[in-house]
UniProtKB/Swiss-Prot annotation:
E.C. number(s) listed in UniProt: 2.7.8.7
Compartments, record wording: Cytoplasm
Main location: cytoplasm
Catalyzed reactions per annotation: apo-[ACP] + CoA = holo-[ACP] + adenosine 3',5'-bisphosphate + H(+)
Keyword Transferase part of the UniProt annotation: yes
Classification via HAMAP family: AcpS
GO CC annotations, alphabetized: cytoplasm
GO biological process: one example: fatty acid biosynthetic process
Keyword Nucleus attached: no
The name this protein goes by in its record: Holo-[acyl-carrier-protein] synthase
Length: 122
């Protein structure tokens, strides 16, 4: 199953300016924030992860009929390699033993985009 999302980076900037740490704490995990602060241009990094979480959420719901919250989806950076997706939700471990969640993130100027793919492990 595939999920796709695109977000205007300005939208994330507006949410950050309006809600501050409350927004960050509700959407992103500690490890995601640490990565974005340390390794990337902060705003596009956040926006790409927002799009990634949306894409994973869409693919996950379509495949399994399980609605995930943003903070239950963790997209961890791997400099030079594809990001790692971790689902932090009780009860899905059994499902994920047989599936792999793959995400690709990108950002360019004003937009960030993500594609998520859930595939059965071989």
């Amino acid at each position: 199953m595939i999920g796709v999302d695109i977000v205007k980076n300005e939208r994330i900037k507006d949410a950050l300016e309006r809600f501050g740490d409350k927004f960050l704490d509700r959407i992103y995990t500690k490890r995601e924030l640490e990565y974005c602060y340390a390794h990337c241009d902060f705003l596009p990094c956040l926006a790409a992860r927002w799009a990634g979480k949306e894409a994973v959420l869409k693919a996950f719901y379509t495949e399994f009929k399980i609605f995930l919250r943003f903070k239950e989806i963790e997209i961890l950076g791997n400099r030079g390699r594809p990001p790692t997706v971790v689902i932090n939700r009780e009860g899905v471990e059994e499902i994920l033993k047989n599936y792999e969640v793959i995400v690709s993130l990108s950002h360019e100027r004003d937009y960030s985009v993500a594609v998520a793919y859930i595939k059965k492990k071989s």
